[in-house]
Amino acid sequence: VYKRQDLEGGKQPMFNEDGSLVCIFNGEIYNFQTLREELIAAGHTFATRSDTEVLLHGYEQWGNQLPGKLRGMFTFVIWDQKTKTMFGARDIFGIKPFYYYNQDGLFLFGSEIKSFLAHPGFKKELNEERLPEYLSIEYIPNEETMFKNVYKLPSGCMFTWENGELTVERYYEIKYHVDDSKSLEEWEKIITDTFAESVAAHQIADVEVGCFLSSGVDSSFVVNEVAKGTPHVKSFSVGYAEEKYSELPYAQEFSKEIGVPSIANKVDAEQFFEANRLIQWYLDEPMPNPAEVPLYFLAQNARKYVKVVLSGEGADELFGGYPMYCQAVHFMDYEHKVPKALRKAAGAVASKLPDFKGKHFLVRGAEEPWQRYMRANYVFLDPAERDRCLKKNYHSPRPEQFFKPYFDKVQGLDEPTQLQWVDMHTWMLYDICLLYTSDAA
């Protein structure tokens, strides 16, 4: 998916004036116009109005400082013919996918693993050692994939490939700090204004923009904001043929209330299961999230009308929308009021008693935040139970080795914020972004 701001001028691969640099790029740079003006002021001359060309001139001007100046969803690679160096980066949230294969002197990269199949040097091998992780949490919680020697470039990271050596560095890290200097009303205005500006930035395109709409607050908020400036924006919703499982009536009711055209389709059980094999092929790796099926049909329907859609994904991680974030507040209060030794004792006793109201709270209240997170996100808490599903034994890490290193990096933060930070580096990156990326849909 290439740039839309300059449909003709943005053709790729794109070269600089003397042909020494070449760039390929997937995504959107929302602040490309501001960067373009800055580069023109620095003496650069542009032949197009595309953001691909901004990347080329930006690399000439700023080198590996370029990714830190970009606002958007992107992956890009620039080859420097003079230095025989390859440079690339992925956006800070990992919205756009980037896979690479690095083995026996062969370096391949792409937005999809299946693109590597066209190269005769690519060895398609199952990465069996990662099966225990996948069965435990339903995704691979690191840079590896289910294919041997195929890796994911982490979000907020850039890489350099030179003389057969690959170097990966982080250019951005999500940081949290508490600012008590403003009132609730002031923060409400700041968030509202920032949200409106962000939605406007996402609509910079030469083609019509639509919106995905469910019955949730996040997508409803996006559609409502878009409709303020684009009254005839189309909303797209999907539901199930069995009404009791469908959110479609709520989405259509909201569309009607704000005066936005609603385009909807329904999925029945037969369609659901028939489409699953094809969907897994598109996603390259196994994906157990059931939302993949309705999303596939939603995207198929939307593409008949528009090329670009906005959605509300990522809001739960950013604004603390998941139930476990709210539960964490109660655990914090419990920890402040009850000494650790007493909490440990209460949890140990409760775990041995028959079920009673409050038992699970006492058991979880005796645990560390990473243990509570693991309990909420694991399919198999017992490695022995998980390993019984496998045909052979693998040297897999214990459950605590998956998430504890992430929590160790944010120990000084309150528990809800720790959960948000970990989700942004794991669940959102390896599940949500893969599921909702336009490349897969």
Sequence positions of predicted segments:
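Active-site loops and adjacent core secondary-structure elements that bind or stabilize anionic groups
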Residues: 1
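ATP-dependent adenylate-handling active sites, centered on carboxylate activation for C-N bond formation
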Residues: 41, 81-108, 175-403, 435-441
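Alpha/beta-hydrolase fold catalytic core
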Residues: 419-435
